[in-house]
UniProtKB/Swiss-Prot annotation:
Pfam families membership: CcmD (PF04995)
Its biological purpose: Required for the export of heme to the periplasm for the biogenesis of c-type cytochromes.
Biological classification of the source: Bacteria, Pseudomonadati, Pseudomonadota, Gammaproteobacteria, Pseudomonadales
GO cellular component, one term: plasma membrane
Name of protein: Heme exporter protein D
Ranges that cross the membrane: 19-39
Keywords, in A-Z order: Cell inner membrane, Cell membrane, Cytochrome c-type biogenesis, Membrane, Transmembrane, Transmembrane helix, Transport
Source domain of life: Bacteria
Location of the protein in the cell: Cell inner membrane
Organism per entry: Pseudomonas fluorescens
Protein family according to the UniProt entry: Belongs to the CcmD/CycX/HelD family.
Gene Ontology process terms (BP): cytochrome c biosynthetic process; cytochrome complex assembly; heme transport
Membrane association type: Single-pass membrane protein
Length: 58
């Protein structure tokens, strides 16, 4: 599929809104799938560090 201009590429024969929204949602899901475990691990390590400090203070 070829387009006459970049504007035509973005419009995608009047399906651009659907196509680019689908790409954006897909990208958001991929980013969340990468970020969620990283943030969960960070939160877990912080909680464990707090727990360890509490136990050693007693």
């Amino acid at each position: 599929m070829s387009f006459a201009s970049f504007s035509d590429f973005l419009a995608m024969a009047h399906h651009g809104l659907y196509v680019w929204t689908a790409y954006a949602i897909c990208l958001a899901v991929l980013v969340l799938n990468v970020a969620a475990p990283i943030l969960a691990r960070k939160r877990y390590l912080q909680q464990e560090a707090r727990r360890l400090r509490r136990e050693t203070e007693k």
